[in-house]
């Protein structure tokens, strides 16, 4: 029997497609995950930057806040970044501050004047109180971007264009520790010493056909974290470098010093990612901790 819609028009052909719910759910989830991971959560291998960090660096470039210029208020830069990104100002400022924190990045991409936080767990000053510009390494990440070496796409409201990736003259993929947690996917690439990476790259370029991971590890001994610390499972490094997956176990360099009835634990550095907040200090209240 024919069916009629609200306009009393006869509908004679109803095309109903039967689909498998499991297959459709899987496909839709994968499409969603890929969109979130690429657009927000996971750094690109080309420059090892998340989209928000790339937008921040590009904003410094187009506003001429390079390393040789005087820094300007972070709040002003955040406002310019929002033209490229629909993020909130607080989230954008947090991402900007991270690019300047020397205990989180082995080679900071932003130079900041004012309080940008510290290892004690203290947060940064408000954006209206700090000034920022690109660091010299930040300059290198954007060098030659005006020479048609990367693709550009419209921003979210198509009012201007932004780069898909940065030229990345500095090997940020290996030297800049960055991580991301997306949908069913996470990434964490640790930092390495620039001189060691440079030497390894030079060796690889002249020994492409025969170069092995073991050869490269003659130059790159292991990760180089900004806060120091020592790797206690160094024997696993070769497997981690070959597979791209693994766990690094770290501990600080420390001395135990006895003075009469008292004992001091003197820490000389910290494992990467550990801050001296209350959670770290609480178990150590009976000791005198010094020399950080």
Question: Residue ranges of each PLM-predicted region?
Answer:
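Catalytic phosphate-handling regions of large nucleic-acid enzymes and associated NTPases
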Residues: 1-244
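Gly/Lys-enriched N-terminal cap/neck module of very large, oligomeric protein machines
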Residues: 248-292
